[in-house]
Structure formats: C-alpha cells, structure tokens
Amino acid sequence: MVNFNQFLKQAQTMQKKMQEAQEQMANTRYTGKAGGGLVEIIATGKGEVEKVSIDASLLKEEEKEMLEDLIKVAFNDAKQKCDADSQNSMSGALSGMSLPPGFKMPF
C-alpha cells in the first residue's frame, strides 16, 4: 500500500507539472493550413484564434464556399495539433505517478 504522505507528495508534484504544462500550452502557437497554404490560422494552446491569413486569389465571390471550407479545415488542423500536444504534455506530467489500476484521467 502506498504511504499517504508519499501519495500527497506525488499529487503535489503532479499538480505542479500539470500547471507548468498548461502554462507552456497557453504560450504555444499552432498553425493550421488548408488548400496548400492558401488559408492559414494561428491559434493559441487555449484554442483562441490569433490570426487568419487568406490568399488574395480566394477573395472572389465564386470562391466563397471553398474559402469557408478551407477556413474550417485550417482551424481543425490547428486544433488537432494543439490537442495532440496537450495530450503529450499531460501524459508527461503524470509519468512516475503511482495511480491505482484502472484510474482514468479526465483528458
């Protein structure tokens, strides 16, 4: 059985590592691209869009629907990169913890 004081110390260490990982994620920028770079979105680790870049060739009425699709694809690309990085960061923060068998984390 794990000593309660040891468990508390591990929990404090895990909390500190998770806070550091969250701060690092918040300061990281993710670039999502679509249409071979015709549309780019830069988002923060918090999922906030900072910048949208659209190639001038897409700014025509007949390209409206394609542009809307490319913006969606670029945003989802940036979000997927952020989510993958978040999962890796949180997994790293939890390494070395003695968690009970079957314990699932909320992320």
Curated annotation (Swiss-Prot):
Q: Does Kinase count among this protein's keywords? A: no
| Highest taxon listed in the record's lineage | Bacteria
Cell cycle as a keyword of this entry, yes or no, is: no
Which UniProt keywords are given for this protein, alphabetically ordered?
A: Cytoplasm, DNA-binding
* Subcellular location field: Cytoplasm, Nucleoid
Q: Which Pfam families does the annotation name?
A: YbaB_DNA_bd
What does the subunit section of this Swiss-Prot or TrEMBL entry state? Answer: Homodimer.
Q: What is this protein called?
A: Nucleoid-associated protein RBE_0048
What species is this protein from? Rickettsia bellii (strain RML369-C)
